[in-house]
């Protein structure tokens, strides 16, 4: 299959992956209205074309939390990334490292912190959930610090798991799910050989290191599901802010008042996000939520954004709406599933190329030049 655009990787991933895995990353909550609007609202935003601006010295570089990024992009935390390619977190981290951007390891990664961090040169970011088992949280934070993690991404929009109906249809969950997954793996021999056989162990590395005695991936997913904490409040985050001395980013902000609370809390950054449309269907797309949040807190902390970003043009649109940096989630997993580390590296090259074209034709020589005046319309 020819890959000529960043969006080509989705079809390539669908061909390679068993349906239960493809639809797990591709799907969203309930009827998936927010999932769809994340993409459509962003792609509907019109950029303002400018000409004859001497764009010969264009640069994508930016600064974030004391780091120089080759472009204002980081790879988002995505659970089970190691099921999409053999030791997938390591492959994705290496690709990000080679292109000069951060990689964020998920709490529910297949590869543990101690396997991923030594595989790359630049400091890694780590994502953590609020769980009932505070001992696990402290253990994860201590291990992250020991591994040289610089930035903590704290996900707060998952006090309960979202209802993802597509998973029951695809075989990720529901009746006879294990048998259905085995049948799907048999009909996808490349994945079965590369990941199903040689990608073991298939557990959640960060959790198995803490719990020990693994009894299978489903056991860990069950433990995680029972540990999400609906009683979470800002007060529950105070001990983490005291413990974690590096940059701390609150992920899952969709309302300006919550963004202001993050400033008062002392967060270094926020991620404007609806969890890729995977939690509460019917909420605002990130593109629609971002402008008001940026107006409320820009300059008080760093603003990151995710959900719906598929191309370099989308990156420029998010920056124009008020983001300092964006996180890529599904887009990099599609590329990883299709072509491994090389696929993620190529995706990032395509994103950078698309950004350069968009910036050249909107008259923005530097990332700081991208703003609301780069747009004809807001979402």
Curated annotation (Swiss-Prot):
Compartments where located: Cell inner membrane
Residues annotated for substrate binding in this entry: 24, 129, 164, 278
Domain FMN hydroxy acid dehydrogenase: 1-379
Coiled-coil ranges per UniProt: none
UniProt-listed Enzyme Commission number(s): 1.1.-.-
Highest taxon of the lineage: Bacteria
Reactions listed under catalytic activity: (S)-lactate + A = pyruvate + AH2
GO molecular function list: FMN binding; L-lactate dehydrogenase activity
Cellular component annotations (GO), alphabetically ordered: plasma membrane
Entry binding sites for FMN: 106, 127, 155, 251, 306-330
Pfam families: FMN_dh
A GO biological process held by the record: aerobic respiration
Active site (catalytic residues): 275 (proton acceptor)
Cofactors required: FMN
Topology of the protein relative to the lipid bilayer: Peripheral membrane protein
Enzyme class of the recorded protein, top EC level: oxidoreductase
Family annotation (InterPro entries): Aldolase_TIM, Alpha-hydoxy_acid_DH_FMN, FMN-dep_DH, FMN_HAD, FMN_hydac_DH_AS, LldD
Cystine pairings recorded for this chain: none
Keyword Ubl conjugation: no
Keywords associated with the record: Cell inner membrane, Cell membrane, Flavoprotein, FMN, Membrane, Oxidoreductase
Similarity annotation: Belongs to the FMN-dependent alpha-hydroxy acid dehydrogenase family.
Matches recorded under PANTHER family: L-LACTATE DEHYDROGENASE (PTHR10578:SF85), S -2-HYDROXY-ACID OXIDASE-RELATED (PTHR10578)
Record function comment: Catalyzes the conversion of L-lactate to pyruvate. Is coupled to the respiratory chain.
Protein name stated in the entry: L-lactate dehydrogenase
Species whose genome carries this gene: Stenotrophomonas maltophilia (strain K279a)
Lineage summary: Bacteria, Pseudomonadati, Pseudomonadota, Gammaproteobacteria, Lysobacterales
């Amino acid at each position: 299959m020819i890959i000529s655009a960043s969006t080509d990787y989705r079809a390539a991933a669908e061909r390679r992956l068993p349906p239960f895995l493809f639809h797990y990353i591709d799907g969203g909550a309930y009827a998936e209205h927010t999932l769809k609007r994340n993409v459509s609202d962003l792609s509907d935003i019109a950029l303002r074309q400018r000409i004859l601006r001497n764009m010969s010295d264009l640069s994508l570089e930016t600064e974030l939390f004391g780091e120089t990024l080759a472009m204002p992009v980081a790879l988002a935390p995505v659970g089970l990334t190691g099921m999409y390619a053999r030791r997938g977190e390591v492959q994705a981290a290496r690709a990000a490292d080679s292109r000069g951007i951060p990689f964020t390891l998920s709490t529910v990664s297949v590869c543990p912190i101690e396997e991923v961090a030594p595989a790359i040169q630049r400091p890694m970011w780590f994502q953590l959930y609020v769980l009932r088992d505070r001992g696990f949280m402290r253990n994860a934070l201590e291990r992250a610090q020991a591994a040289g993690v610089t930035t903590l991404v704290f996900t707060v929009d998952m006090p309960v798991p979202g209802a993802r109906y597509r998973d029951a249809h695809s075989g990720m969950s529901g009746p006879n799910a294990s048998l259905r997954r085995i049948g799907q793996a048999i009909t996808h021999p490349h994945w079965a050989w590369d990941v199903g056989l040689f990608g073991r162990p298939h557990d959640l590395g960060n959790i198995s290191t803490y719990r020990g005695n693994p009894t299978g991936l489903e056991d860990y997913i069950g433990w995680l599901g029972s540990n999400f904490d609906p009683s979470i409040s800002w007060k529950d985050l105070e001990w983490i802010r005291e413990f974690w001395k590096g940059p701390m980013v609150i992920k899952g902000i969709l309302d300006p008042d919550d963004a202001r609370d993050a400033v008062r809390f002392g967060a270094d950054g926020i991620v404007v996000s609806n969890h890729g449309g995977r939690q509460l269907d019917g909420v605002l797309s990130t593109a629609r939520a971002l402008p008001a949040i940026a107006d409320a807190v820009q300059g008080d902390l760093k603003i990151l954004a995710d959900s719906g970003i598929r191309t370099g043009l989308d990156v420029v649109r998010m920056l124009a709406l008020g983001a300092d940096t964006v996180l890529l989630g599904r887009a990099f997993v599609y590329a990883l599933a299709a072509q491994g580390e090389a696929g993620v590296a190529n995706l990032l090259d395509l994103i950078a190329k698309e950004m350069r074209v968009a910036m050249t034709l909107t008259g923005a020589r530097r990332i700081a030049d991208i703003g609301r005046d780069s747009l004809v319309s807001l979402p």
